Amino acid sequence: MARKVIEEECEDYFLGISDLSNSKQITTEQYASLIAIYPRAISIGITLPPKTNENSLMSNSVVYNETNNQLNTITVYLSTLLEQEGYKALAVPKAGRVNNGIFFSLHRLAAISADLGKIEKNMVVTPEVGPEVNWGTVLTDAPIGVMIK
């Protein structure tokens, strides 16, 4: 049931589910204790709107804040749903700043482990929209199979 709800809630977004315990990514080593508890990652990506020249710095900040809020809402909802079904789940928080160390790396790791993109210039780049995606992540032990949408 959880997987169906996840797919429905994320139908307008990039969505991938990966098994981090089988990931070949080098960065998984630094998260070994977390992955032992939460071996699967649900990666959710929201496409950013096209950039405008007018007030681009301000509009970028507003866009990231809005998408961060959306991602926080979605990931908390999904982690609560998984916990209600008896699984462990952790909504990885979105920070106010885009480049926030550990959580930023976890979002990238989850997205590339789910084959939603590849790393270029230290960013996740998707085939569909390049790097214009903001990522959110839920870590869980729920037995939801790997998927890419």
Task: Locate each region found by the language model.
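Non-catalytic, usually N-terminal nucleic-acid engagement modules in DNA/RNA processing proteins
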Residues: M1-V63
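Catalytic cores of enzyme domains
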Residues: N60-K149
